Design a protein with these regions (language model features):
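Short, positively charged and aromatic/hydrophobic N-terminal segments
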Residues: 10-35
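A structured, charge-rich N-terminal accessory region that forms the first stable segment of a protein
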Residues: 41-105
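Hydrophobic/aromatic-rich, well-ordered segments within soluble, folded domains that form packed cores
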Residues: 160-187
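A glycine-rich, hydrophobic loop/mini-helix early in the fold
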Residues: 84-142
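Long, compositionally biased
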Residues: 191-232
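Internal catalytic-core helix/loop-beta-alpha segment
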Residues: 135-162
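Short, structured patches in soluble enzyme cores that scaffold and shape functional sites
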Residues: 73-75, 115, 193
Length: 232
């Protein structure tokens, strides 16, 4: 059952809308091929622009470097968002990527793209299990049940449970410290807030950024999105 735009907006506002962020990126890069996005009379986003948007925000996950990414979409910028997303199902399924619409309103939707096998293994790590257990999850449950519980909490609380970092593959140490320090006193801020081993995290973040740049360049050069998505 869809929640109202007002109900879901308090969650959506916690993370950037990929469409709007992409417009900023579009202005910086001056990509004329995506100039439709800056026109007030633009009606819908093309498939190629959607692929570029996915690449810009989710390349590390689609290229196999990162196990998951959470993106928000403004559905009115698509002629048919459901159909657009569904058209990628064969590619994602073949490459081992699952898609879960975590929270949805009339206007916005939060979509989790994740490599189920990797996340399923990750949540069974001793430190990840301990954190989930401390947050009230059944750490013996399979990934599907854990995600259903995460989804339920997001709908009820209308905010991001801190443990969502575990489902995005963030180090449990960083997730736990984020909770304990209430998001403050971190050693490094990048793709997430780092509390332990900032040097390793800095190198990882640099790899993610390089991956995104390479992915987007290949798309610009004419590569097919499906060919750039790595199987796992």
């Amino acid at each position: 059952m869809h929640r109202s735009c007002m109900e879901v907006s308090c969650i959506i506002d916690k993370i950037p809308l990929v469409n709007e962020n992409y417009l900023q990126y579009n202005d910086i890069r001056k990509r004329e091929k995506f100039s439709f996005a800056n026109r007030k009379d633009a009606m819908c986003m093309s498939r190629s622009s959607f692929e570029a948007l996915l690449g810009f925000h989710g390349a590390p996950t689609f290229a196999g470097e990162k196990p998951a990414v959470l993106l928000s979409f403004k559905k009115s910028q698509f002629e048919d968002f459901d159909a657009m997303l569904a058209s990628f199902t064969p590619c994602f399924r073949c490459k081992g990527i699952s898609v879960l619409r975590l929270v949805e309103g009339e206007e916005y939707v939060l979509v989790l793209f994740y490599r189920a096998r990797r996340i399923a293994r990750f949540v069974k790590r001793a430190d990840a299990r301990a954190l989930l257990r401390s947050c009230g999850y059944d750490d013996d449950a399979p990934l599907s049940v854990l995600l259903a519980e995460l989804q339920r909490r997001m709908e009820i609380k209308k905010t991001f449970p801190h443990e969502i970092g575990i489902f995005l593959g963030y180090p449990p140490e960083d997730v736990r410290s984020f909770i304990e320090h209430r998001g403050k006193d971190f050693a490094l801020s990048g793709y997430w807030k780092v509390y332990g081993n900032p040097d390793a995290a800095r190198a990882l973040f640099a790899r993610y950024t390089a991956c995104s740049e390479e992915f987007c360049k290949k798309l610009d050069d004419g590569a097919r999105f499906e060919d750039l998505v790595v199987a796992s």
